[in-house]
C-alpha cells in the first residue's frame, strides 16, 4: 500500500495557509482552497503587470492637467521637453506637477520656448 507521507501533508498545509482569510469552503476544503489559491496567484501576477500601466496612465493624466493650466497640451509639453533636451521621466514630472507647481511652470515655459524656436 502506498503511503503519501509528510510531503503531501506539507503541501496541503501550505495551500491551506495561503488560503487563510478566504470565505467559506475556500479556506477549509483543500480542493476548493487549491483552486482559489491558483486563481489568486494568477490574478496577482496579471495585476502586477497591469499596475505599471495604470500608474503610467495616472502620471500622464496629472501631467496633462498641469500642462493645460499653463497653456500647453500634454503632447506639446512632452515634445517641447524633448526638443529642449530635458530628460525627466513621467513619474518625476507628475510629482512636480502635484507638489512643486512653480518648478513645473518653469519647465512648461522652457518647453514653450523650445517649440517656438523649432
Curated annotation (Swiss-Prot):
<dbReference type="GO" id="GO:1990904">
    <property type="term" value="C:ribonucleoprotein complex"/>
</dbReference>
<keyword id="KW-0689">Ribosomal protein</keyword>
<keyword id="KW-0694">RNA-binding</keyword>
<dbReference type="InterPro" id="IPR049946">
    <property type="entry name" value="RIBOSOMAL_L20_CS"/>
</dbReference>
<dbReference type="Pfam" id="PF00453">
    <property type="entry name" value="Ribosomal_L20"/>
</dbReference>
<protein>
    <recommendedName>
        <fullName>Large ribosomal subunit protein bL20</fullName>
    </recommendedName>
</protein>
<dbReference type="GO" id="GO:0019843">
    <property type="term" value="F:rRNA binding"/>
</dbReference>
<dbReference type="GO" id="GO:0003735">
    <property type="term" value="F:structural constituent of ribosome"/>
</dbReference>
<dbReference type="GO" id="GO:0006412">
    <property type="term" value="P:translation"/>
</dbReference>
<comment type="similarity">
    <text>Belongs to the bacterial ribosomal protein bL20 family.</text>
</comment>
<dbReference type="GO" id="GO:0005840">
    <property type="term" value="C:ribosome"/>
</dbReference>
<dbReference type="GO" id="GO:0000027">
    <property type="term" value="P:ribosomal large subunit assembly"/>
</dbReference>
<keyword id="KW-0699">rRNA-binding</keyword>
<dbReference type="InterPro" id="IPR035566">
    <property type="entry name" value="Ribosomal_protein_bL20_C"/>
</dbReference>
<keyword id="KW-0687">Ribonucleoprotein</keyword>
<comment type="function">
    <text>Binds directly to 23S ribosomal RNA and is necessary for the in vitro assembly process of the 50S ribosomal subunit. It is not involved in the protein synthesizing functions of that subunit.</text>
</comment>
<dbReference type="InterPro" id="IPR005813">
    <property type="entry name" value="Ribosomal_bL20"/>
</dbReference>
Amino acid at each position: 500500500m502506498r503511503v503519501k507521507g509528510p510531503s503531501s501533508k506539507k503541501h496541503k498545509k501550505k495551500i491551506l495557509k495561503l488560503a487563510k482569510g478566504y470565505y467559506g469552503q475556500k479556506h477549509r476544503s483543500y480542493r476548493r482552497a487549491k483552486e482559489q489559491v491558483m486563481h489568486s496567484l494568477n490574478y496577482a501576477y496579471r495585476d502586477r503587470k497591469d499596475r505599471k500601466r495604470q500608474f503610467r496612465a495616472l502620471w500622464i493624466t496629472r501631467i496633462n492637467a498641469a500642462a493645460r493650466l499653463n497653456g500647453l497640451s500634454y503632447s506639446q509639453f512632452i515634445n517641447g521637453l524633448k526638443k529642449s533636451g530635458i530628460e525627466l521621466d513621467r513619474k518625476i514630472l507628475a510629482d512636480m506637477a502635484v507638489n512643486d507647481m512653480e518648478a513645473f511652470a518653469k519647465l512648461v515655459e522652457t518647453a514653450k520656448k523650445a517649440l517656438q524656436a523649432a
